[in-house]
Each structure stands twice: as structure tokens, then as C-alpha cells.
Amino acid sequence: MVNGSTQYLAHVGELSLKKGNRRQFEVQLERNLTLMLRSINPHVTVRAGRLYLSVPASFEAQTTAEQALSCLLGITGWAAATACPKTMEAITRCAHAEATLAAREGKRTFRIEARRADKRFCRTSSEIAREVGAVIHQSGALSVDLHYPDVVIFIEVREREAFLYGARRRGLRGLPCGVSGRGLLLLSGGIDSPVAGYRMLSRGMHIDCLYFHSYPYTPPEAQKKVEDLAKVLARYGLSTTLTVVSLTDIQKQLQTHAPAPSLTLLLRMCMMRIAEHVAREQRARCLITGESLAQVASQTLENLTVTSACTHLPIFRPLIGADKEDIIRTATEIGTYAISIRPYEDCCTLFAPKHPVLRPEVEEMQKQYQSLMLGPLLEDAFRTRKRTRIYGNYGVQESGE
């Protein structure tokens, strides 16, 4: 704590490897965390591979800061830290205070890990660790255990000051959201699409979301589920726009006039065409889906080829080769799984045929699609879309548009 503030130190991730764009990525990381914490007036700086965060020394501010750091893409780890002058006396004094606190909490053994980033400092990393460790050991506060210590005290001598910290929490890694453009996620209520969105967020892409419903055949609870999924994604991406489009009239037309085995695939073709219009309106440069090869009948190689041919935009499928158990594990980690398994059907499952087409030809499906004269219905669906802006939960409320 310095001058009534609490300090945090975070290790940045891949952006430290991006030589030419490094400063751009650092600025984006600073901006993202500042936006997450704008309700508590933070001070954020990224330099030399570290992110420095200072927030007011209140319980509410610290809780908000730690929630934000837990959702911040672009860092590999973070910790609450103590800053002190770059002298051995100050470093030793602060380290001894950390050891004394650990002893009061019932810890018995310790190890020092020191890193001298500023090579001008008067001691090497090993000398810092040895000298500070000797003082703590001789004081009787804790005993040395280099292999299985109860507590590790980290010391970093940086270019302006030194930092000491104990427990280090794992970061999400990846790239800062916003450095890789904008994409439109086709967000259903299932397990896969939120994970696909998170995967693209972790590669630095800002995502907006598109949800298709078929009210009254799909209940309002199904849309509420998707809204809750979008809120979770907004925690990692700062914000998202959720566009909701009704497919009710289109599905009625397909149910009446389309060949039964082609129903799901024709519906997917309609979705892709509408999605392209929404994406261009929102300046998204790609579409994102949660499709995984051969996971269900509509995701055979041939079916994916047909839907890809319906848009001029690239379709990113980050889960295309993923195992279902791995997808579920990620969904659980990011907080979407419990929402996704709520028992409400989406529009794709309502009228799914018993024996869907598995090996369609692109030309044949395009002929079927064109014969249905769906253009006016697609235009109506796009025209009656509804949008909601959703923000991450860092003291900012969501607002409708």
C-alpha cells in the first residue's frame, strides 16, 4: 500500500513478443483495464513486460480490481504487491514484514525468489535472495525450505522501484481484447458457441453477438439464457452488442415447402446470409461459430462447405477440431456451462428432421434455397432485429438500444 492506495503487479503475456506492435498492444492492455475499473479511478501503466495497477485502498476497490484482473486477457499472472525504494535496506525491511505476516497466519517455512530486471542494481538476483533470506531466517520469523515452502516471497527489482509479493494468481494469457479487429459470434444457447467466442476474445478480437429465436416456439427463457451468456462474455471483452433476430416466419416457410432432410441446413443458410448483413452493419470482418467437425449431423464437412458458401465473409470455427470434454472444461472455467445447460431449446433443434442430409452438394442446396423465394422473409427478419448493448460487470449497467 502506497499513499493510501493498493498496488498490483501483473506479468504480460504474448504481447511482449510482438516486437513491431508491442507498444500498440501495451496501450490496448492499459485501455482495457482502465475501462474495466473506471468506476474506481485506477492508475494503470504497462512497461518492460509488467503491468502496474494502483487503486484506492478500500475493500470495494480491491475486490473490483481483483475481479477485473481475473478476467483481463493479455496477462499470465498477477499479485497484490508492495512497492519500496530500490535499496537493500528497504527491500529487506519489506520482505521481513511479509514474513512476519505469514508467520502470524500459521506459515512456518519460506523461500525467496528474486529477479533483478534493472542490471544496474548493486546485487545480483541470487545475492538478493541469499541476503534477504538470511535476515528472515536469523530473525526466527520463518525457517528456510527451498523445495516445499509454505510461502514464497517474490522480489522484483524494476527500473524505478522494487516490488515484493506473495501468492501469485494465474492470468488468462492470450492477447488484449481489441488488437485483432471485430467479429460477429453466432451465439446459441448451447455449450459450444460461448466457448468459441471466448477463444476469439483470447486472440484479441472484439466480438459482438447474434442470436436467432423462433418465438413463440422458443420460450422467453431461451433468450434470457443467451443474454446471460453474452453478459459472461462481456466480462472478458469489456462489452458486446447482442442482436436478436426472429426466424419464426422463415421456419414456417421451410417447414411447409422445404424437403424435410434439408430443413436444418437450409435454416443455417438463412442464418449465414442474415449474419453477413448484421456483421457489415457492425463493421465486423468475420463470422464466428461454435461448430465442431462431425459433432452433430449438421456439422459434416459437406454441410459446413454449404454454409460457408452462403457468405463472402470468412467464417472462423475455433472449435473445429476440439474434443467435447475439452469444450465443457473451458465452459466451466469461464462460467458459461451452468447457463448453457438450462433446459430451453433453440430454434435449430425445434424442427430438426429425424434423418438430416449429411453429404449435400453445394449446387443442389443452392437450387433448393433459391426455389423457396426466401429473400423478402430474410429482409423482414433483418429489418425487425433488436439490439442491446451489454457491458462487463465492473460498476457499469447495461443499456438497451
Curated annotation (Swiss-Prot):
<feature type="binding site">
    <location>
        <position position="290"/>
    </location>
    <ligand>
        <name>ATP</name>
    </ligand>
</feature>
<keyword id="KW-0808">Transferase</keyword>
<protein>
    <recommendedName>
        <fullName>Probable tRNA sulfurtransferase</fullName>
        <ecNumber>2.8.1.4</ecNumber>
    </recommendedName>
</protein>
<dbReference type="GO" id="GO:0005524">
    <property type="term" value="F:ATP binding"/>
</dbReference>
<dbReference type="GO" id="GO:0005829">
    <property type="term" value="C:cytosol"/>
</dbReference>
<comment type="pathway">
    <text>Cofactor biosynthesis; thiamine diphosphate biosynthesis.</text>
</comment>
<feature type="binding site">
    <location>
        <position position="268"/>
    </location>
    <ligand>
        <name>ATP</name>
    </ligand>
</feature>
<keyword id="KW-0694">RNA-binding</keyword>
<dbReference type="GO" id="GO:0002937">
    <property type="term" value="P:tRNA 4-thiouridine biosynthesis"/>
</dbReference>
<dbReference type="InterPro" id="IPR014729">
    <property type="entry name" value="Rossmann-like_a/b/a_fold"/>
</dbReference>
<dbReference type="GO" id="GO:0000049">
    <property type="term" value="F:tRNA binding"/>
</dbReference>
<dbReference type="InterPro" id="IPR003720">
    <property type="entry name" value="tRNA_STrfase"/>
</dbReference>
<dbReference type="InterPro" id="IPR050102">
    <property type="entry name" value="tRNA_sulfurtransferase_ThiI"/>
</dbReference>
<feature type="binding site">
    <location>
        <position position="299"/>
    </location>
    <ligand>
        <name>ATP</name>
    </ligand>
</feature>
<feature type="binding site">
    <location>
        <begin position="211"/>
        <end position="212"/>
    </location>
    <ligand>
        <name>ATP</name>
    </ligand>
</feature>
<dbReference type="Pfam" id="PF02568">
    <property type="entry name" value="ThiI"/>
</dbReference>
<dbReference type="GO" id="GO:0009229">
    <property type="term" value="P:thiamine diphosphate biosynthetic process"/>
</dbReference>
<feature type="binding site">
    <location>
        <begin position="186"/>
        <end position="187"/>
    </location>
    <ligand>
        <name>ATP</name>
    </ligand>
</feature>
<dbReference type="InterPro" id="IPR020536">
    <property type="entry name" value="ThiI_AANH"/>
</dbReference>
<dbReference type="GO" id="GO:0009228">
    <property type="term" value="P:thiamine biosynthetic process"/>
</dbReference>
<comment type="similarity">
    <text>Belongs to the ThiI family.</text>
</comment>
<dbReference type="InterPro" id="IPR049961">
    <property type="entry name" value="ThiI_N"/>
</dbReference>
<keyword id="KW-0547">Nucleotide-binding</keyword>
<dbReference type="Pfam" id="PF22025">
    <property type="entry name" value="ThiI_fer"/>
</dbReference>
<dbReference type="InterPro" id="IPR054173">
    <property type="entry name" value="ThiI_fer"/>
</dbReference>
<dbReference type="GO" id="GO:0140741">
    <property type="term" value="F:tRNA-uracil-4 sulfurtransferase activity"/>
</dbReference>
<dbReference type="GO" id="GO:0052837">
    <property type="term" value="P:thiazole biosynthetic process"/>
</dbReference>
<dbReference type="InterPro" id="IPR004114">
    <property type="entry name" value="THUMP_dom"/>
</dbReference>
<dbReference type="Pfam" id="PF02926">
    <property type="entry name" value="THUMP"/>
</dbReference>
<dbReference type="InterPro" id="IPR049962">
    <property type="entry name" value="THUMP_ThiI"/>
</dbReference>
<comment type="function">
    <text>Catalyzes the ATP-dependent transfer of a sulfur to tRNA to produce 4-thiouridine in position 8 of tRNAs, which functions as a near-UV photosensor. Also catalyzes the transfer of sulfur to the sulfur carrier protein ThiS, forming ThiS-thiocarboxylate. This is a step in the synthesis of thiazole, in the thiamine biosynthesis pathway. The sulfur is donated as persulfide by IscS.</text>
</comment>
<keyword id="KW-0963">Cytoplasm</keyword>
<keyword id="KW-0067">ATP-binding</keyword>
<keyword id="KW-0820">tRNA-binding</keyword>
<dbReference type="GO" id="GO:0004810">
    <property type="term" value="F:CCA tRNA nucleotidyltransferase activity"/>
</dbReference>
<feature type="domain" description="THUMP">
    <location>
        <begin position="63"/>
        <end position="168"/>
    </location>
</feature>
<keyword id="KW-0784">Thiamine biosynthesis</keyword>
